[in-house]
Amino acid sequence: METWHLDIEEFVELRKNTGDDRRRTHDMNTANWVPDLFMERVFEGKKWTLFTPNETPDLHDLTGAAFKKRYEEYENAAKEGKVKVFKEVEAEELWRKIISMLFETGHPWITFKDSCNLRSPQQHAGVIHSSNLCTEITLNTSEDEIAVCN
């Protein structure tokens, strides 16, 4: 799941051993795809806006400068009331939650989306959205083919 997704706070806790078991998954491997912009906001002590993919459908397929431009457009649209479902959080606080869960449970694995896509030798195949379990092998997917690494 990407860090801008509205459900990211609940997602990072899926592997937690305490709490309501109906909100946990003990056998699923989870990964968080982090854009550079999020880390910039963490370092700068700024806010981060969470969105629903229903209102921001193109963010999933954007990286780097294109992601930053569109993400900031959605933030402005949210402030103007054009985006209805969103939540502002402190970027550093969200990062601490992610890192705390990684330390506590080993999940979610963190993959830096912009770095993976910038260095991909298969950029012609589209944006990388997944990897193998240890995140050292990135996998292209498309509407016609789902990538799997066993």
Label each PLM-derived region with a short phrase.
Residues M1-N150:
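Active-site cavity-forming subdomains of large catalytic enzyme subunits
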